[in-house]
Amino acid sequence: MKVSIMNYKIKQLEKSDIKQSIEIWNDIVSDGIAFPQTELLNEETGLEFFNSQSFTGIAYDKNSGEIVGLYILHPNNIGRCGHISNASYAVKKDKRGHGIGELLVKNCLTKAKELGFKILQFNAVVAINTSALKLYKKLGFTQLGVIPKGFLLKDGTYEDIIPHYIEL
């Protein structure tokens, strides 16, 4: 069943959102095919992690309140490169294909600009993440090349990564 993107809104993470957010995040970390992290979050480390970001956005269903996705936004570097931001996105598995990822990325672009960032850069888009690659192309991101075997998959094999950026 296709759900209208109009059913979803994005807000800043609140403490009451931590448990559902950690579940979504950990699901992707456990898959071992998209996020570089290997350690799962618990409520303590999750609260610390999400609160350490410049912004953590939560996509939720306006009718049920269910959290269906999230993003984290933070500086990619420091000092003279501190104007470049980095972000990661997570959509609940059973909610993929409903436009939530696009909603998250668009909100992130706006928020990054509001926070004074000039560029949004993705360091490690895994080549097998075809949905993300298609979305970033649609939204106007530029591919920076390919880093062969730059990502260690959960099964112990390596996959290429494709860094991207967009000027804000």
Q: Which residues does each PLM region occupy?
A:
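A short beta-loop-alpha structural element at the N-terminal edge
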Residues: N7-S21
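Helix-loop element at the rim of GNAT/NAT acetyltransferase active sites that forms part
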Residues: E23-E39
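Conserved beta-strand-loop-alpha-helix junction that forms the acyl-donor binding cleft
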Residues: F122-A132, G150-K154
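Conserved active-site tyrosine of GNAT-family acetyltransferases
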Residues: Y136, F141, H164
